Every structure is written in C-alpha cells, then in structure tokens.
Amino acid sequence: MNKSINNLQDIFLNNARKERIPVTIFLVNGVQLKGIVKGFDSFTVVLDSDGKQQLVYKHAISTVSPAKPILFNNAQVFDN
C-alpha cells in the first residue's frame, strides 16, 4: 500500500500558497491575521502580510478562511 496519502490540511494550505490566495487566519484567542501563505510544516504556517512575515503556530489556529474557494480534486486527496 502506498503511504503517500495526502491529508486535506496540507492540500488546502499548499493550494492557497501556490495560487497566492489571500487568507484570514482566526486564532483561538479571537485575533485575525490576514495575508498570503508563504509556507508551512507540521507545526507552523508562515504568513506574509504587507511584506511582513509572521510565523503562526498551528495549535493557535482555529480557522483558515480563504478569500476565494480553493479548488482541488479527489486525486489530490486520495492517492489510488
């Protein structure tokens, strides 16, 4: 069995990054951060907001809301 099954979180963030879709990140404390996803790993997201970079820890994120729908197909989600 192929162990390269992509998870939805990675696909979502990667498409937001590649397409440079503006996102609003809502933190668990209510703070809103707006910007472009520049990169991410298992624990953090790097957000570019007006030329300033912010490293946001995923455990502090409640919601990521894109400015427009992020399109992906089932082939990205499920590796046959």
Swiss-Prot record:
Q: Which domain of life is it from?
A: Bacteria
HAMAP family documented for this protein? Hfq (MF_00436)
Q: Which family, according to UniProt?
A: Belongs to the Hfq family.
Gene Ontology terms, cellular component aspect? cytosol
Phylogenetic classification of the source organism: Bacteria, Bacillati, Bacillota, Clostridia, Eubacteriales
Q: One biological-process term from Gene Ontology?
A: regulation of DNA-templated transcription
Q: Fill in the subunit field for this protein.
A: Homohexamer.
Q: Which gene encodes it?
A: hfq
Q: Which residues form the Sm domain?
A: 10-70
Keywords of the record, alphabetical order, are: RNA-binding, Stress response
Q: What's this protein's name? A: RNA-binding protein Hfq
Q: What does this protein do?
A: RNA chaperone that binds small regulatory RNA (sRNAs) and mRNAs to facilitate mRNA translational regulation in response to envelope stress, environmental stress and changes in metabolite concentrations. Also binds with high specificity to tRNAs.
